[in-house]
């Protein structure tokens, strides 16, 4: 057996360069590049290997480990999981920063390869800089925290262990049914150790992502169930997008006259204008989808995990039977469903062929539901502040709105701004979101005029994903305009990769909605009987000792200008229109700082969310919220 002598890190780089995926006959390199923040735990091992011979890997310099790993996740998501980025950090805090990203990837079933440096395998210099010492187990390091949030975890304590570790890593990264974060911990001494690796380990490997076919028995079960129902509703999940099954999905819906609703991950797979597309469903869903969902006698979930936001905590369609088509048996088995374990496209096509001349019993309900929602959408886009103004989320901070108006010098509403942005940006532009009130507004209001232009991380709803995610999307779609839709709370959490976008000359656009607070959580607490408590951004009041002083006003445009972005301060609809048009002309990243009044986001449309309301309280409003929760639980599925 012929061998080649390399360090562990050099062998890793060489191996990654020779990994390919094949899907529907198309073959491409799997690992496009690697994000790096070098420290003592990885610079002399993996850093040396990348400097000496990176091969075809593109090497990027991150600014925050979570930020760069989030960018890697967004890249893979936008590439429909067919190509990935890796990310490497040093030991200690750098590695710990990526734990949140690992959880984000795993929650969303998005492949990402994380390569944190680790403490010495030999233990000779222990305790090294940034090492945590556990008196009961010296083998534990910061990197063990990744175990709970990774789909595959390994630690390479000897050079020869790299081979089994990486083959298993590729197994998980290329498995549509069970992909997510893969963490390979690399002790800093082992990275530099040499070994005679078999040359066969570095041969070109093609990992075929095959379309799992459904069993004949499961197809028969599905057909029997559908034929027994009059008003089925399809739920379009992210699996349809990742399977690249949009055309098959549309064909299925049209052939059998079955309307469909979208999850956050599924939205944008098919244009919003399709006559059977009801839009977002569930807690952040709209009036049309939730109305039809309550009438449906069968829910057909395709490529969806059926999270609580999709099912409205299992209350939205509690009496309907459930059919699932999912490549993951785990997800297919949810809600005690009749399950078809298969690739989305393969499953839909097999069922369609066997279903024959079935047609649903829907009449005008679908078009009427869409028309009603379109009227509501027009109203939301035209909401403007004025005399006797009532916000969408009424009864919370109504009396404080004049104070916000004066502090901001703005009367803009969040729904009005979203409508204008949707109107003016390019049809093929990609929007990116993750947290706060914006995911609800966008799932309800955003009209996708082109496919794959809606990129929402809502499996983990990671604050700080938006800007790093926009950068990752831009690397995946360099010819498109990309917009991060972000609130002020999330911007403050993490915006480090703005600098990386400037460094790389990859323009992204930040649409910053500043309502000076954690608005959606303020809604949640006040809707459940609490007051406004530590969710508005207010200064400490020396008289009360509470955070109920003056509203904090931050010039985010100045912050971004300091980094080198082209920025705009927006207080009127005219200024917004000018900024959106001018930002398209720029060649560098832009930020539009928009002051919007609180409580002007959308409200729920016939849905309920099960949250942990206090059972005991001195406040009648909290007691009422608890009673309401208990009443809604009676209407929900138990499992």
From Swiss-Prot:
One of its GO terms (biological process) is isoleucine biosynthetic process. Involved in the cleavage of the C1-C2 bond of 3D-(3,5/4)-trihydroxycyclohexane-1,2-dione (THcHDO) to yield 5-deoxy-glucuronate (5DG). Coiled coil: none annotated. Its EC number is 3.7.1.22. Keywords: Hydrolase, Magnesium, Metal-binding, NAD, Thiamine pyrophosphate. PANTHER family: 3D-(3,5_4)-TRIHYDROXYCYCLOHEXANE-1,2-DIONE HYDROLASE, THIAMINE PYROPHOSPHATE ENZYMES. It is an enzyme of class 3 (hydrolase). This is 3D-(3,5/4)-trihydroxycyclohexane-1,2-dione hydrolase. GO terms for cellular component: acetolactate synthase complex. Thiamine diphosphate binds at residue 65. InterPro entries: DHS-like_NAD/FAD-binding_dom, Myo_inos_IolD, THcHDO_hydrolase_firmi, THDP-binding, Thiamin_PyroP_enz_cen_dom, Thiamin_PyroP_enz_TPP-bd_dom, TPP-bd_CS, TPP_enz. GO terms for molecular function: 3D-(3,5/4)-trihydroxycyclohexane-1,2-dione hydrolase activity; acetolactate synthase activity; flavin adenine dinucleotide binding; magnesium ion binding; thiamine pyrophosphate binding.
